[in-house]
């Protein structure tokens, strides 16, 4: 019998992220936790959007940890021109949404991956926003790599065609220093 590893979703809360989260829920692969990051919209809007999707998707029990509000070394950019001012294209929202579990996604990632490593386990992570949360965690505690299973990333380009500039994909472009930290870490990375 194959055991499914725990899954963390790291997301910047845009329309594509909402769809991805709903697809995970529908497929029976609801993340065990979500960490939020700036990107498509600011951190507060991204967090609110993911809490909204969890409420609408019938999974308000999933803990959400608020993460990085800005890139490591450059000004913040967003993709409101695609996702709308609120990040969900103005979609209606429920009257109540769950609360965040914490305001420190980086500490949550460090604690989770170190605990997994000490138990001889690994936790998978699906990153569909800028890589800042994981980069900060790796910078603060490099030993977390022992507890990270498969890292699946929505980022980068294949054939050199970007969606933000002629050669840059948004999630990498939003924080290239964070992307470099993650891509050079000794991890099992899948770019999807």
Where are the language model's segments positioned?
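Surface-exposed loop and adjacent secondary-structure segments within mature catalytic domains
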Residues: 65-93
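A glycine-rich helix N-cap at a beta->alpha junction
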Residues: 53, 57-65
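Active-site histidine-anchored catalytic micro-motif
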Residues: 2-11, 15-52, 92-192
């Amino acid at each position: 019998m194959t055991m499914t590893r725990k899954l963390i979703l790291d997301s910047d809360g845009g329309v594509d992220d909402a769809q991805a989260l709903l697809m995970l829920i529908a497929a029976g692969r609801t993340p065990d936790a979500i960490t939020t990051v700036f990107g498509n919209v600011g951190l507060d809007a991204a967090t609110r959007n993911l809490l909204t999707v969890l409420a609408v998707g019938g999974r308000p029990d999933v803990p959400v940890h608020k993460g990085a509000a800005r890139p490591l070394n450059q000004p913040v950019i967003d993709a409101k021109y695609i996702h709308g001012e609120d990040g969900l294209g103005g979609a209606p929202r429920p009257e109540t949404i769950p609360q965040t579990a914490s305001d420190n996604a980086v500490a949550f990632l460090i604690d989770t991956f170190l605990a997994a490593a000490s138990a001889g386990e690994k936790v998978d992570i699906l990153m569909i926003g800028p890589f800042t949360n994981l980069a900060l965690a790796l910078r603060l505690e490099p030993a977390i790599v022992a507890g990270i299973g498969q890292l699946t990333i929505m980022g980068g380009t294949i054939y050199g065609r970007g969606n933000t500039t002629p050669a840059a994909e948004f999630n990498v472009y939003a924080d290239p220093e964070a992307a470099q930290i993650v891509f050079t870490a000794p991890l099992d990375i899948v770019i999807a």
